């Protein structure tokens, strides 16, 4: 006679074991119709699963985050159902959910085209609209294996052989004639799976191992209703317009080529943005009392073995040999900073020491994961390491957090998700040390008035960390900033200071990054601004142009005045109509176009237009110079005349 406790604290008693759906039916027909699954004692369960003992129960509907994830997982099975009908020889591998959707890896000799995706999507919708029931059966390990052997599914058999114990009873989900295996839960009926779209096909190795066969990965998105789907597809269209690779080419910022995969060739305008970011961060380093250093980008294998990178990170490190010595190009800056700290005796009075570097790092990322500026092999980190005592952790982390928000707000990022990752199962140090470290981070977050999500067990083995993820104008999250405590590396590299009692102590090291990879951050802000960089970042801040040849000398004079004031300015004296010039520089996202005609010359002024099409009227040259200088100096996000 199970007693079911509902979220509002009310209870319902049943004479016999009862399913999740039956409990929903006892509450009301509307809830029963909306039921996708349930959370029994905190664990997600199928709507058909029986509850045999006293339990808590939350009904999961399409309005819940879990409900949407279940819809997406069931759409992966629906894709399996459809592809088996259109391509009977296909072998099914795995089909998990991902952010905003799902994918299925399939083994198929035929190379899938966009036309194939359209046909698959059409068949999926035809199947879903029959609103068939999804039937769940728990079977023995042997029955599951026999089922997939008969159906010619070697990947499902491999999953059973390698991942599921023989005394287990895996769940098989029946979509009419199609059968798939999954932990679940899944929707009880396909009426929940009407709003989806197949997006693309990519290659993927079985089990992610390049030694295995290359499969075809079909990506899709799925949502609870048509409105959500259309809104998401609209966001994707906007994201495509903002793609930093497309804008980077149009604005001549950088390029990449096959001979240097994952490495950036910065062109003049892109490098201008890069240097402006460095200059900005340098002003903040001075403000927050950091010293700037520069370490070598390549060091002997012996050092990397001491740090543990060689053993744990070796696959991602580029190596070379010289004079019978093996070297690795640094994937990160921290070991070099410890070497600098170790030069000379340090006292507790010297701490904290805040050491920053714009470090050129390289990581041998898989070629398939490379993506424009967002995922590269060669990058520059705005990295810093703070050497301090345990007593200084909280105040130093508090300062790091203030610096993070100070810098992000300059770019207009105010919606920031904060996550605190705590001790993993495998870790160094005792519980007391971890208690102090985690509490220090939590106190620093509280001191800054920040709400945060705790990620249990997600910290590094050497210390807990805080992550900062920017949410952009398309509601995407970009994890950029980190504040990481490290109780291991300083000791491994024999870092020490003389404490107040004259004993040698090992300092705590705080790893701190704000922009993260400067390359990636440029990609992020290129998409955030859609290439309309604020005037302080714009490679060219103003273009001065004439209407006829008679204004050429005045244009050159105005251009020199702006240039002498430290502004990035160009002149356009081409024999073209002024409307043509304005359109061209508007497409180049130049903030201001200064038009000089006979009237402007006679008054000593310029006619000012913006890249958004606003005609701001005339300004004296001196007045406009001061306006633009103030915008650049204060790093304003908006142009003159913009609200």
Curated annotation (Swiss-Prot):
Annotated Gene Ontology cellular component terms: cytosol
Keyword Metal-binding: yes
Cofactor: Zn(2+)
CDD domains: TGS_ThrRS, ThrRS_anticodon, ThrRS_core
Gene3D superfamilies: 3.10.20.30, 3.30.54.20, Anticodon-binding domain, Bira Bifunctional Protein, Domain 2, Threonyl-trna Synthetase, Chain A, domain 2
Recorded superkingdom: Bacteria
Keywords annotated in UniProt: Aminoacyl-tRNA synthetase, ATP-binding, Cytoplasm, Ligase, Metal-binding, Nucleotide-binding, Protein biosynthesis, RNA-binding, tRNA-binding, Zinc
Family annotation (NCBIfam families): thrS
This protein's name: Threonine--tRNA ligase
Gene source species: Mannheimia succiniciproducens (strain KCTC 0769BP / MBEL55E)
């Amino acid at each position: 006679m199970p007693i079911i406790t509902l979220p509002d604290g009310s209870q319902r008693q049943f004479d016999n074991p009862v399913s999740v759906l039956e409990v929903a039916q006892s509450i009301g027909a509307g809830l029963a119709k909306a039921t996708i699954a349930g959370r029994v004692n905190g664990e997600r369960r199928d709507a058909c699963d029986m509850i045999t003992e006293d339990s808590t129960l939350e009904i999961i509907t399409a309005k819940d985050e879990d409900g949407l994830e279940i819809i997406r997982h069931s759409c992966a099975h629906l894709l399996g159902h459809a592809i088996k009908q259109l391509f009977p020889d296909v072998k099914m591998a795995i089909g998990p959910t991902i952010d905003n959707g799902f994918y299925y890896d399939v083994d198929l000799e035929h190379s899938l085209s966009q036309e194939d995706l359209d046909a698959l999507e059409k068949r999926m919708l035809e199947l879903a609209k029959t609103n068939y029931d999804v039937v769940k059966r728990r079977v023995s390990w042997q029955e599951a294996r026999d089922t997939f052997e008969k159906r010619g599914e070697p990947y499902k058999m491999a999953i059973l052989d390698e991942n599921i114990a023989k005394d287990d009873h895996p769940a098989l989900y029946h979509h009419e004639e199609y059968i798939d295996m999954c932990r679940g839960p899944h929707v009880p009926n396909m009426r929940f799976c009407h709003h989806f779209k197949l997006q693309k096909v990519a290659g993927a190795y079985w089990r992610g191992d390049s030694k295995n066969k290359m499969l075809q990965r079909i990506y899709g998105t799925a949502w609870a209703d048509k409105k959500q789907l259309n809104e998401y597809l609209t966001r994707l269209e906007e994201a495509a317009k903002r793609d930093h690779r497309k804008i980077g080419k149009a604005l001549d910022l950088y390029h990449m080529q096959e001979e240097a995969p994952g490495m950036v060739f910065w062109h003049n305008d892109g490098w201008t943005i890069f240097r402006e970011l460095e200059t900005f961060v340098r002003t903040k380093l001075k403000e927050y009392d950091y010293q700037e250093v520069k370490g070598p980008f390549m060091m002997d294998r012996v050092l990397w073995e001491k740090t543990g990178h060689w053993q744990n990170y070796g696959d991602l490190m580029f190596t070379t040999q010289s004079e019978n010595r093996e070297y690795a190009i640094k994937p990160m800056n921290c070991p070099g900073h410890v070497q600098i700290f170790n030069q000379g005796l340090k006292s507790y009075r010297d701490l904290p020491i805040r050491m920053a570097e714009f470090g050129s790092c390289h990581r041998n990322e898989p070629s398939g994961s490379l993506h424009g500026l967002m995922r590269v092999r060669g990058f520059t980190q705005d990295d810093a390491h703070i050497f301090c005592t345990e007593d200084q952790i909280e105040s130093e982390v508090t300062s790091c957090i203030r610096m993070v928000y100070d810098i992000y707000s300059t770019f207009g990022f105010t919606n920031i998700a904060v996550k605190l990752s705590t001790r993993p199962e495998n870790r160094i140090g005792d519980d007391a040390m971890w208690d102090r470290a985690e509490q220090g981070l939590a106190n620093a977050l509280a001191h800054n008035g920040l709400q945060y999500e705790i990620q249990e067990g997600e910290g590094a083995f050497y210390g807990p960390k805080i992550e900062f993820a920017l949410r952009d104008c398309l509601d995407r999250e970009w994890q950029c900033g980190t504040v990481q405590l490290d109780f291991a590396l300083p000791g491994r590299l024999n870092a020490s200071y003389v404490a107040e009692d004259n004993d040698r102590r090992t300092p705590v090291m705080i790893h701190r990054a704000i922009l993260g990879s400067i390359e990636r951050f440029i990609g992020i802000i290129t998409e955030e601004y859609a290439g309309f960089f604020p005037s302080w970042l714009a490679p060219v801040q103003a273009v001065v142009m004439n209407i006829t040849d008679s204004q050429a000398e005045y244009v050159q004079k105005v251009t020199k005045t702006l240039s002498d004031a430290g502004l990035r300015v160009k002149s356009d004296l081409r024999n073209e109509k002024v409307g043509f010039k304005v359109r061209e520089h508007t497409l180049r996202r130049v903030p201001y176009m200064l038009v000089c005609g006979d009237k402007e010359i006679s008054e000593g002024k310029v006619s000012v237009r913006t890249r958004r099409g606003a005609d701001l009227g005339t300004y004296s040259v001196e007045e406009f110079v001061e306006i633009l200088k103030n915008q650049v100096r204060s790093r304003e996000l908006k142009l003159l005349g913009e609200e």
